[in-house]
Amino acid sequence: MTFRSPIFELSHTYIDDEAALSPMGCTYLGNGLNQDKLDDFSIAGAAVSADLTRKTLKKLLALKPIDEIDRIAQTVMQERLESSLALHDSQESFVLWNVLTSPPSNVRSIFELMPKSTDKDFDNIAKRLAAVDGAYKSWTGAIMEVAKGGKTTAQRQVRGVIEQLTNYANGGFSAMCKNFDAAGKYPAIHENAKLAEKAAAETAEFLKSQYLPIANPEDAVGADRYAVWARYFTGAKLDLRATYEWGMADLKAINARMWEIAGQIKPGAKTLREVADHLDKDPKYVIKGKENVVKFLQDFTDAAIARMDGEYFEIDDRIKICEARLAPEGSASAPYYNPPSEDLSRPGTTWIPMLGKDEASSWHLVSTWYHEAVPGHHLQCATVAIEKERLSRFQINGAWISGYGEGWALYAERFMNELGAFDEPGIEMGYLSAQALRAARI
């Protein structure tokens, strides 16, 4: 293979080398390697990955860019590798897990991205299910070791992950396998689903009895720890006080607008929760049945792509497919997006968690699906996936920065607001509630 520069070549090699240490990373890439295994979440496993990162960073800094494209590729890779090492060296990477992302939920969701066409595919699924116990144990061993140094996850998040694991244990993996193989052609996956459920039950009990009592009773982590994560999530060194004050001011402005809209939706309402409950019950927005929710979101996504293409963006034909699917029970508690595989054989996918319900309300889904699909994450990530001439392989697959990544999707919502997509009061309230959540996070 010919590369435009040594920096692009190193980027390409690093993605391969890192994927070799992460079977789940291979699945995300779609390269077909190690599909019968799961990641090693142990401290020793993380050390191997950190060693690779350190060696790669040293090689990267010794290279000279040949042009502006190269300079940007090098700068992005350097910042991400340095931020990743900061998390590893401080052991922060072992304590940021929650109801949105954690090794248990990532293990569960990776099965949804695996190929399911051949006998070999199902053999991989069976073997990977059998590996769940080992993956979970490698993780619990790591977090207990880190806890000895005083670093633990917030109790509220621990309880949430226990609940997710309990969902997996109570038939979650079996239901998944029935969905994959309704005819029962591959008995091994159904048998091994029981093993995975046993592992989930044992892990939930371990967290409840061993980890929860020593977990952090507070959500706050303090300025020093916050700064490490702020750098990782934004790629920048922030003035934390100024950022906090900006977030508070933004939340105040959003809140004021929400109350203006609340008066149009439910005059006399005493709380915004009361307004949200009213919208949840409004027949105009209620979608009954999981299949109908998915159909609504798929139709919505297809319509958004058709509307945006040619008028506001030139969307490549290769990325005009973006699927809407049901998220596994017990997975992330909010909608999310998975980019396409490197070769585009697996399309970009949006996921809707139903949280045990059989209906949803569209008033808050409209802005969310502009955020997740088009012109949000799908347009963003799928476009990046095909820009192989201008972006290094690391920029495409390894350089996700929330400040830019989520910033794009948040702007996508604001862009649609500018186009009048949220003129209806209920839909605007959904948009504003999502904006308020992001401002409150800051």
What are the functions of these language-model segments?
Residues 1-442:
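N-terminal maturation segment of proteins
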